[in-house]
Design a protein with these regions (language model features):
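Active-site neighborhoods and metal-handling regions in enzymes and metal-associated proteins
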Residues: 1-213
């Protein structure tokens, strides 16, 4: 779940296990998130947060997804600057006072590869202002891009949010195909194992952090 108010973003996620045997996996990501948040304060290396997530996951019998990460958040930038890893591998950067971060452990079973891969299904899209050369677009394409930039200001969106723009559906598909509109693929665990996610957005201070989601 994401919220954007005048460009200020909060990002959060929960996993609900519909199958009872998957509840331990869902709970493990919640515990890993809680332990990571306890360690978040100005000056802490981001690699330390990743190590905490990994050690917590392993202690509970699960494995973190190594190629999914948390991230810094800035105004109108959901993924900005610093990366918050979910494993203990070297990763540059330290948490900065006053900065906003989304920390989000993704976990899978020990049978999993510990990484996700892309599928062909794409349901989330984004137009990055300033990177689309409007003068190279035809009239309806240019109009659609301008509408998307004005409405979402570079933030991700899904098709159900633009049902009022159905007359542009064909142009949208064409702009996705030629790369002027970026499309995010649906991700799955490489070996087909289940994945859980827990996420909060925090503001980092000198002596800790405040959860705002």
């Amino acid at each position: 779940l994401g919220v954007c108010l005048n460009g200020y973003i909060a990002d959060t996620a929960v996993t609900v296990a519909l199958a009872p045997d998957l509840e331990p996996l869902a709970e493990a990501s919640r515990i890993a998130l809680r332990e990571a948040i306890k360690a978040m304060r100005a000056g802490v290396p981001v690699s330390r947060i990743g190590l905490i997530v990994q050690e917590t996951a392993n202690r509970l019998g699960f494995k973190p997804i190594r190629n999914l990460t948390g991230h810094e958040i800035k105004r109108y930038e959901l993924h900005a600057g610093t990366t918050i890893p979910n494993i203990g591998a070297p990763c540059p950067g330290r948490l900065q006072e006053g900065h906003v971060y989304a920390v989000e452990p993704f976990l899978t079973t020990m049978k999993g590869a510990g990484e996700v891969v892309s599928t062909r299904l794409r349901t989330i899209f984004r137009v990055e202002p300033g990177k689309v050369k409007l003068r190279k677009l035809k009239g309806e394409e240019r109009e659609l891009i301008n509408l998307l930039i004005n409405r979402f200001k570079g933030m991700p969106y899904t098709l159900r949010w633009i049902k009022d723009l159905d007359r542009f559906r064909g142009f949208h598909e064409r702009l996705v195909k030629n790369g002027r509109i970026y499309s995010y693929p649906v991700l799955v665990e490489r070996f087909g194992e289940p994945v859980s996610q827990s996420e909060h957005t925090v503001i980092v201070f000198e002596d800790g952090c405040e959860v705002i989601t």
